[in-house]
Design a protein with these regions (language model features):
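Active-site cleft segment of glycoside hydrolase catalytic domains centered on the general acid/base Glu
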Residues: 153-154, 216-345, 364-378, 404
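Sec-dependent N-terminal signal peptides
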Residues: 1-6
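Catalytic-core region of carbohydrate-active enzymes that cleave or remodel glycosidic bonds
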Residues: 328-425, 470-474
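C-terminal motif of bacterial Sec signal peptides marking the signal peptidase cleavage site
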Residues: 9-12
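Glycine-enriched alpha-helix->loop->beta-strand junction motifs that scaffold or abut catalytic
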Residues: 166, 318-319, 383-386
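Non-catalytic accessory regions flanking glycosidase/transglycosidase catalytic cores in CAZymes
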Residues: 16, 21-29, 33-37, 41-45, ...
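Intrinsically disordered, low-complexity segments enriched in small/polar and acidic residues
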Residues: 20-22, 66-68, 76
Length: 533
């Protein structure tokens, strides 16, 4: 094996435009130092200069200068791309400049010998491969949506429990069994109002389950040609929504849930489609900019009901803004679903569709750390949103966050999968999936770490390789990187923290390394975190 000569590249970080002044930069031995941005660099004996050195305010595009080589020329630093620019703020020579927000420009290591040989992965049952040189955008946390799962009034759980996992959306109504009329509708409205308040606080949308407010007590819409009761109910709901200031894009109208399931729809397919049309037109007339989604079918993204729905919507000009479906029966895959529904929409020329929403995912058998992590990887790969199914009964329906916590809001092992998913920042890394195993991975030079959430859709036990290629220089100074491997064991009991399997430096060869997981229980989930040693 040929040794690798490492050259470390430095990245510039910026956060809102303000940067601390460096405390005296210095020249490298025998080299020419790069300068900071917006000030005069200091001098010293070895090291690097960062930002301003005793000068005017550091510019928003400024950052860290390059490291001077020993006996050679220095490598220019890369500047961050931040908000405000101070006086005199040009980026460092050779740096990357831009505008807006907090970013780090990830710099790749430069191999000293291009003839080196990457490590050969050991024999394994399955593997995933990461290419850290291939960036695929910022985090969106697509899979962190929930159906009910918080208190009926929306005040619980504590906010920190939700923000840590980057909640993406809520979905709620309130099924009330009893007399059809104002009393039942008022109970249902209190839940919607409470959930909306929490969603607004977190800056995420609420999907209103219209049928959950109506179907359990009232006559089927259009029975005998009579739409009076349903129209009255819709009028009341629309009036409440308008009075509560809920007419913006942070509210989505889901007009009926799982009409292809006999437990939620007793009529014909044609009657359901007419119900969709009546509700759609009533909402559109009252709130022209309303966001409407559907059909939320139990049979997935394809099939006869979905095809009939899309054809009907096109013919009657009642196309939803978001198309939704469920994979709650087991065996679903967001990537395959996205391909199926995209083709169906494109074939029909439904240009008004804004996006897709798999708003119930995961059977009871799939709600474990391993399969949940696999789902998260698939949602990010597909680029569509997902909301966890809620299989709880009674009061737990409003206190389990989709089986992520105990009834007194204590995190369990699945919660920690979503917590590490929420911890991911920076730029998504290209991942080649295995047969049963997939991963979602991000790197963030500003945060100084890369987090890899690894999932198993079921069945695979034994050795699983996580092959990591093109590791950037900031993660491997001196030819090694620190690898933390955490295990989230299957189970519903409270878990204060994941189990640490290992935490040690790993050798990097040809900018690559291999982390091997001994996956003893397929339903466990794993997280790999890389940091500089």
């Amino acid at each position: 094996m040929v040794a690798v000569g490492l050259v470390i590249a430095v990245v510039g970080c910026s956060s809102g435009g303000d940067h601390p002044a460096a405390s005296g930069g210095s020249t490298g031995t025998g080299g020419t130092p790069s300068t900071g941005t917006g000030g005069t660099p200091g001098t010293g004996t070895g090291g690097r200069s960062t930002g301003d050195t005793g000068g005017s305010p550091n510019p928003g595009t400024g950052g860290v200068t390059g490291i001077a080589g020993s006996g050679g020329s220095s490598i220019a630093g890369a500047s961050g791309t931040a908000g405000r620019t101070g006086a005199g703020g040009a980026p460092a020579t050779g740096g990357i400049s831009g505008g807006g927000g907090m970013t780090c420009a990830p710099a790749q290591s430069v191999g000293g010998n291009t003839a080196c040989t990457p490590p050969t992965p050991p024999s394994a049952k399955d593997s995933v491969t990461l290419d850290m040189a291939a960036g695929q955008g910022a985090p969106a946390y697509h899979g962190s949506g929930f159906i009910y799962g918080i208190s009926e009034d929306g005040t619980q759980p504590p906010t920190a429990l939700l923000t840590a996992i980057k909640v993406r959306a809520f979905r709620a109504g309130r099924g009330v069994t009893g007399n059809c009329g104002q009393a039942a509708w008022d109970t249902h409205w209190k839940v919607i109002k409470g959930y909306y308040a929490r969603a607004k606080e977190l800056g995420v949308p609420l999907e209103i389950l219209v049928s959950d407010d109506y179907q359990y007590s009232c006559p089927l819409p259009g029975d005998g040609g009579d739409w009076t009761t349903f129209t009255t109910f819709m009028t009341q709901l629309i009036d409440n929504v308008k009075a509560n200031g809920m007419t913006g894009p942070d509210v989505r109208w889901e007009l009926w849930n799982e009409a292809d399931y006999s437990g939620f729809w007793k009529g014909t397919q044609a009657q359901w489609l007419d119900t969709w049309k009546h509700a759609y037109q009533q909402v559109r007339a009252a709130i022209p900019g309303a966001i409407i989604e559907g059909p939320s079918l139990s049979t997935g993204a394809g099939g006869s009901w979905m095809n009939a729905f899309l054809d009907f919507c096109k013919t009657n000009n009642v196309v939803p803004d978001y198309i939704s479906w469920h994979d709650a029966g087991g065996g679903g895959d967001p990537v395959n679903d996205q391909a199926t529904i995209s083709k169906a929409v494109s074939t029909r020329g439904l240009t008004g569709v804004k996006g897709f929403d798999l708003n119930e995912y995961g059977s009871t058998g799939e709600q474990n750390p391993g399969h949940s992590a696999w789902f998260l990887a698939r949602f990010d790969r597909a680029g569509i949103d997902g909301l966890r199914s809620n299989w709880a009964g009674g009061s737990e329906f409003f206190s389990n966050m989709g089986a992520l916590v105990t009834t007194n809001w204590q995190p369990n092992s699945q919660y920690w999968i979503y917590r590490r998913y929420g911890d991911q920042t920076g730029t998504r890394i290209a991942v080649t999936a295995g047969t049963q195993v997939d991963a979602v991975a991000y790197q963030d030079a500003c945060a100084g770490k890369s987090i890899v959430v690894v999932g198993n859709k079921g069945g695979t036990t034994g050795s699983v390789n996580v092959v990591i290629k093109n590791i950037p220089g900031w993660l491997q100074p001196g030819g090694s990187t620190k690898v933390l491997l955490e295990r989230m064991p299957a189970g519903s009991a409270a878990l204060s923290a994941p189990a640490v399997v290992s935490n040690a430096a790993a050798t990097v060869t040809c900018n690559s390394t291999v982390v091997t997981i001994n996956w003893t229980t397929a339903t466990d989930g794993y997280v790999v975190t890389l940091t500089p040693p």
